[in-house]
Amino acid sequence: MSLINQLPQKVQKELYKNSLLKIISGLNNFDIESVQMIAKAAAIGGADVLDIACKPSLVEKVLDITSLPICVSAVEPILFIDSVKAGATFIEIGNFDSFYEKGIKFSANQVLSLTKQTKDLLPHIPLSVTVPHTLSLDKQVDLALQLIKEGVDIIQTEGW
């Protein structure tokens, strides 16, 4: 069952209109000043969601300056717990770009494993998962279908 209905009304509306604007500060951007500056720009620019690195203190500092819903991104499911407690609205397995720069790629099986671990830890929190662009197109489609079966609420793709 989808948890989309747990997201703020505005986010739900924009998702259904296929026009959600999510600004990403970066999976590994833990610089509070940088993320706060991005958050301010996102709010001024009309963003619907701010996607930040998964760190509770970062969530708290960003929520001090914006009312935008916060999505936290990580590839270690255990990290999500404290960020959700700190106020993150939803969670995402994704923003893999910082790993690609290091030559690290995520397989479909790795993404599925991370998804299952995350759903086990936080079954009542909306979950977004990014399908890696490094997979062949047919493998991306297969993974997306498997993610739906796993109960993922939002599936994202990467553009390269």
Region spans (language model):
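Alpha/beta enzyme core
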Residues: S2-W160
